[in-house]
């Protein structure tokens, strides 16, 4: 008999775990900064770079705690990202082109404008161009954590908008990692990965619903991708596409669907362990000897400007233009000022930005540290200003009525109806 799980809605579970996990991530990042700037700094760096073994590839050498987190545990994070993408596209908020239109427009502009701003600030500085994708990412957990601090003042339509934009943003980030941050390809290992993925899809087509089978194949796929030169975390997204899924339009999520079961099982681990661990292992930057010349160097300044200015300009500007041109409707129960504030919260890059930063400048500790400074500055500014604006923004006149309707939909069915005024 399939194991039952509460709650019935994957979307409600997602919103709750991302919010709570985001708050934990905030504390993990703050703790990392405190420790990295204290007498415990040496112990902190020795711990995260401690060799644990074994040697999985000649390129990586002996595995360290940091490598296990960034190349191992983050593959599980990307597996969950892939599951969320598949669920939303097949049976959720992105199941139709009408629903995809606004998040796609917002996410595309929200990646393009920050990247363009970054390139403007770094100019022709040698070796910095490959960091263009760092400010293009959004940390959904961190942003949802900030929204959670606002309680009922954050309209559900804004939370759902943030979720869908971030999911499309994640798709873009995955594509960027696969296309632009891939080392020399080992064709034999890549062929093995393709064969393993083919077996996973064959199991899906054959009606295999045992998650242990898929998880065993996922481990093999991860190792093959690690050997191939394509970043191993991509294995998570690819594996997610092969997990069987049962559509439940207009009804609660199926308790026998392998994808739903795996998503529910992974959410707590990813939100409360993997993402905070990643934040703690990657956010520790020693700023004790930091001068203004380092803060305003092209790399950190370009990243900070891309996250704080680029995201809000790209997302809010594209949403406003789409509504004015009749391409999409306004978000139900949300004012323009609230939409602007959430556009700022999308500038919290953190997890994905730190991850891309480590790929953009491999082996260059100085540039990676400068990238971290820019990510922390841009993310912190986006979080603080976005929170303040959303906290002070007047509520929409129909706030209470729209909230009651939205919560009823989420409680009964994860397939929430369109949250734009055009759908009314």
UniProtKB/Swiss-Prot annotation:
Query: What molecular function terms (GO) are annotated for this protein?
Result: sodium:proton antiporter activity
Q: Which InterPro entries match?
A: Na/H_antiporter_dom_sf (IPR023171), NhaA (IPR004670)
The GO biological-process annotations, alphabetized, read as: regulation of pH
Localization: Cell inner membrane
Keywords of the record: Antiport, Cell inner membrane, Cell membrane, Ion transport, Membrane, Sodium, Sodium transport, Transmembrane, Transmembrane helix, Transport
Entry's transmembrane regions: 23-43, 65-85, 102-122, 131-151, 160-180, 183-203, 211-231, 265-285, 303-323, 341-361, 373-393
Q: Which Pfam families match?
A: Na_H_antiport_1
Q: What is its main location?
A: membrane
Q: Which GO terms describe its cellular component?
A: plasma membrane
The record gives the membrane topology as: Multi-pass membrane protein
Q: Which reaction does it catalyse?
A: Na(+)(in) + 2 H(+)(out) = Na(+)(out) + 2 H(+)(in)
In UniProt terms, what function does this protein have? Na(+)/H(+) antiporter that extrudes sodium in exchange for external protons.
State the similarity comment.
Belongs to the NhaA Na(+)/H(+) (TC 2.A.33) antiporter family.
Supply the HAMAP family for this chain.
NhaA (MF_01844)
Q: Can you say what this protein is called?
A: Na(+)/H(+) antiporter NhaA
